[in-house]
Amino acid sequence: MTVTRNGCRIFPKLHYEVHGLVADKCYSMVFHIAAQFKEPKFICHPAGIKMGALWTSRTISFEDFFITTNPQPTDNSMIHLPPHCKFTPILDVYEVVLDHMQQPATMHRVSSCRLPYTFMTVTMYKNREARVLKLGMNPHARHFLKNNTNKNHLDTASLIPPIPSVQPLPLFPLPQNSMSYTFSYDTYPSNIHVAPIQLPFPFPAVLSTLASSLQLCRDGDPEEIDEEIDIMN
């Protein structure tokens, strides 16, 4: 996945469905990235604390967050990841207990969803077919294709998965002292299930295309070959 100093949206889009929550209990969705050599930055869903009935009735989206090479991002929606860094998005579901003032007192993690893939940040795609394929599947990056259509032609329409529509949740931000919660990590209830709606790519077709491209450059520059291997992660 490409990363710049100005920030790139995380792709594939982070859309989730949650099942098995208790309808009248409060929950919060917390997202972070597990990355090499980096302490995770935890980001609460902007909808804040909601009842289980609401979370299970809507699509949960974390698509409005960005990764950046800037080590000191000023925007809370930015997550710093250096180039050539392996990472995996993770969504945790916390049950929230409110005090007598209806303020959060404790948070207890009840479920977690880790994508079954490891990604790697790169500053560019050197292989033409891989570049057009990846950009063609990312709606946030398709404007790059307009300047490269003639010299980087590749039909990717059949490989682009449908992007589900998302019904936004009403905003209810967490209080400023939300980071003072007490977190616990006991065994998850077996009835709660979190799953991504859209898997990253139709991987068999994509990997087959990338493997063919890699075979053509095996005798090329070693650094370029390394870069192409990064794309597959």
Curated annotation (Swiss-Prot):
Pfam families named among the record's database cross-references: T-box (PF00907)
Location of this chain's protein in the cell: Nucleus
The keyword Transcription regulation is assigned to this record: yes
InterPro entries: p53-like_TF_DNA-bd_sf, T-box_DNA-bd, T-box_sf
SUPFAM superfamilies (UniProt xref): p53-like transcription factors
Chief place of localization: nucleus
UniProt-recorded Gene Ontology molecular function terms: DNA-binding transcription factor activity, RNA polymerase II-specific; RNA polymerase II cis-regulatory region sequence-specific DNA binding
GO biological process assignments: cell fate specification; positive regulation of DNA-templated transcription; regulation of transcription by RNA polymerase II
Keywords, comma-separated and alphabetical: DNA-binding, Nucleus, Transcription, Transcription regulation
One CC-aspect GO term: chromatin
Annotation: DNA-binding region: 1-146
Keyword ATP-binding annotated: no
Protein name: Putative T-box protein 41
Lineage of the organism: Eukaryota, Metazoa, Ecdysozoa, Nematoda, Chromadorea
